[in-house]
Regions:
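Non-catalytic terminal extensions of PLP-dependent enzymes
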Residues: 9-12, 59-67, 71-85, 101-254
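PLP-dependent aminotransferase class I/II
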Residues: 86-97
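Active-site nucleophile and cofactor-binding loops and adjacent substrate-binding regions
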Residues: 31, 90, 184
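Conserved PLP-enzyme active-site core in the AAT-like
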Residues: 1-59, 65-70, 80, 164, ...
Length: 254
């Protein structure tokens, strides 16, 4: 996940030979709602000959090439390829979109990362300042002076005092019009919420989120544990949904 380090460093300088890149968020792809996500693999030159086949390549064409840009495009197999793997082409639409996004913003992507880090640190400190009427303040999931583009909070103190869990907080945030943060990840943080404001949000939005978040921490526990209350679909039985796999999707012709 590159959202904090664009323009600052790269995997090669860090000593990696092969890296899986997440294209969601940092490179324009949606994260929630099932995607479409994509995770292309990048390798150093000495590993290129082992890459799965086929690879797209091009060569100069004296006749102008099929596309009229002076090149002829073709498939090729690396010298010591491991062969074709499942879904070798990846999510091609997501890759092209990410490439276009990267080319469009260029060096401005470095500023994007700077804003993402600034927003995450500001929101973290804004929440941890607390407010009157809060039943119990969360714990910092990873105590550090500075975080990168995201931070974690443990809602264990709130659970111990009034029985409200991280999941309850996430569901209640839906009533306030927010998309729920990542739940219970990483698992080393008990009752974990991972909050990632990204670079797009203004200070006013971050202040409002912090205000609403702290307000929820002081609400009637029963109101929070039975949330959401304003969404079309209320709290679902997740255990039943996991064990009874029935997919229902409305189609236009219906």
């Amino acid at each position: 996940n590159f959202n904090a380090i664009l323009g600052k460093t790269d995997p090669g300088r860090m000593g990696f030979d092969a890296v899986h890149y997440n294209l969601h968020k940092t490179f324009s792809q949606p994260h929630g709602g099932g995607g479409p996500g994509s995770g292309p693999i990048g390798v150093k030159a000495h590993l290129a000959k082992y890459l799965p086949a086929p690879l797209a390549d091009r060569e100069e064409a004296s006749d102008g090439g099929a596309t009229g840009d002076g090149y002829r495009y073709f498939w090729r197999n690396p010298e010591n390829t491991i062969g074709k793997v499942q879904q070798w082409h990846g999510n091609s639409g997501a890759v092209v979109r990410a490439w276009a996004f990267y080319r469009r913003y260029g060096r401005e992507l470095e500023r994007m990362s700077e804003h993402a880090v600034l927003n995450a640190n500001y929101l973290r400190h804004r929440i941890m300042q607390g407010a009157e009427g809060v039943h119990a303040m969360p714990l910092d999931g990873a105590p550090a002076k500075v975080v990168k583009h995201e931070f974690t909070l443990s809602m264990s103190p709130l659970k111990e005092v009034v029985g409200v869990t991280a999941k309850d907080i996430a569901k209640r945030l839906l009533d306030y019009g927010y998309m729920s943060p990542t739940l219970y990840f990483p698992m080393i943080v008990p009752e974990c919420l991972m909050i990632e404001p990204t670079e797009t949000e203004s200070k006013e939005v971050l202040d409002k989120f912090a205000e609403d978040f702290l307000k929820i921490l002081g609400e009637d526990p029963e109101l929070v544990t039975t949330a959401p209350h304003t969404t079309d679909v209320r709290r679902v039985d997740e255990v039943l949904a996991a064990r009874s796999l029935v997919l229902k999707h409305p189609f236009d012709e219906e």
